[in-house]
Amino acid sequence: MYGSSNYKQEISLGIDCGSKMIRLSATTKAQELYSAEVELRNDIVNLLSTRKQYRKTRRSRLRYRKARFQNRVKSKNKGWLAPSIENKINTHIKIIVDLHKILPITNIIVETASFDIQKINNPDIEGKEYQEGNQLGFWNVREYVLFRDGHKCCVKGCKEKVLNVHHIESRKTGGNTPNNLITICEKHHKQYHEGKLKLNLKRGESFRDATFMGIMRWTFYNRLKQIYPNVKNTYGYITKNTRIVNELPKEHRVDARCISGNPSAKPLGYWYYIKQVRRHNRQIHKAKILKGGKKKLNQAPYLVKGFRLFDKVEYNGQIGFIFGRRTKGDFDIRTLDRKSISKSANYKKLKLINTRKSLLIERR
């Protein structure tokens, strides 16, 4: 009535960045206005590795193909990042852009982290020891792994002398790092791959998430700064101190509220769980060729009885998402944490709430 139409409260957005999850909290000094957790896609590495495997096999069947060298994208494009990392950075930015459409955010505070992986492995490391890794003095990884395991098979009581180095997690996604390799004799190695022997093996600690945070940290911050100039950076120790001073519990969404700079703001009382899914399965046929040289389709119909995969629906008063479809019209309905609502819900009993998006949203 008295010139208040142009007045806007200052809203701060706190973002706790992550490799698997993003936590967000938008607050004023008095009230929390938005709280969410976003689950990022972690299937991209496996999908790209599988695609690479099929591509190499396909090319190997073409004998006259010219050798391909010096064709690496990384060497051509400065600032190139792996698709899995690029996707996660873009999702961080997309979430923030979408939130600006519903709230007049004035400040953005981002918490990122850098990890000293060498220090995690060895807290006492210093100086030139950073350049003297575990494999110093060994010809290759295989020689180091054999030495580390005492040139003995991992199967208890085995005294076979012909030894192999086995990947605990598939090399396709696990790589050739020593903590993913173990010594096993040729006899037991063959039995294991034939399914005749079971081994309870767990790979050593993986630093994928720590590596990702180190790569994405400044790239994300600088890209976001180009879109919104009012971006500030903060650190984990500051968030921890804020949480302790205000006697708040250790929860990720609480951390996001502390990052926003308003730890004493009244909690919203509910929050949103957001899950990112891929939009399309671009593999046309299954890799396995059936009898008669036939190829089986790897893609389901776009619509089944008017519904798509991951459509948000209501069934018997419960809200869920379509996780599976059958052509006769019976669907698998679940919540985003995969809790089953119905394994065979008839399409006639479903009420469409929202068509599928790349970001599925569930209020909790």
Predicted region positions:
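Substrate-contacting helices/loops that form the catalytic groove of nucleic-acid
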Residues: 6, 19-21, 27-136, 200-306, ...
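A short acidic-Thr-Gly-centered motif at the start of a beta-strand
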Residues: 1-11
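Histidine-centered nuclease catalytic patch
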Residues: 154-183, 194-197
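Intrinsically disordered, low-complexity, charged/polar segments
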Residues: 339-364
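SH3/SH3-like beta-barrel fold
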Residues: 24-26, 331-337
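Two-metal-ion RNase H-like nuclease active-site motif
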Residues: 10-18
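Short cysteine-rich loop/turn motifs with clustered Cys
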Residues: 101-107, 136-164, 185-188, 308, ...
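Short beta-strand-centered aromatic/proline hotspots
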Residues: 311-312, 318-334
